[in-house]
A protein has these predicted regions:
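N-terminal intrinsically disordered, cationic/polar leader segments
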Residues: 1-32, 37-86
Length: 86
């Protein structure tokens, strides 16, 4: 089976109802892995999944918690994912 994410694009003003994930480094570059749930209050649409990109229209209340130590990412060819590396 092919290991891939299926991307969808949504447009309009959505409200972030949940956002969770982590910011690590892979190959010396920042690596974001975010999961989002967002709601379109005018059309009753809920979208959820991996967040690849977004534009904040006004504000977003996002808190970042810094952990002690270093956490990175490494590619695991066997399962086809970039795994956390402590």
């Amino acid at each position: 089976a092919e290991k891939q994410y299926h991307q969808q694009t949504f447009s309009g003003a959505f409200e972030i109802t949940a956002l969770a994930g982590n910011l690590t480094r892979m190959d010396g570059k920042p690596y974001l892995h975010l999961h989002i749930t967002a709601a379109d209050p005018h059309h009753g649409v809920i979208a959820a999944g991996h967040l690849n990109s977004a534009t904040i229209s006004a504000t977003a209340e996002i808190f970042v918690v810094v952990c002690k130590g270093r956490v990175g990412r490494r590619a695991d060819a066997e399962i086809g994912l970039n795994l956390l590396a402590f």
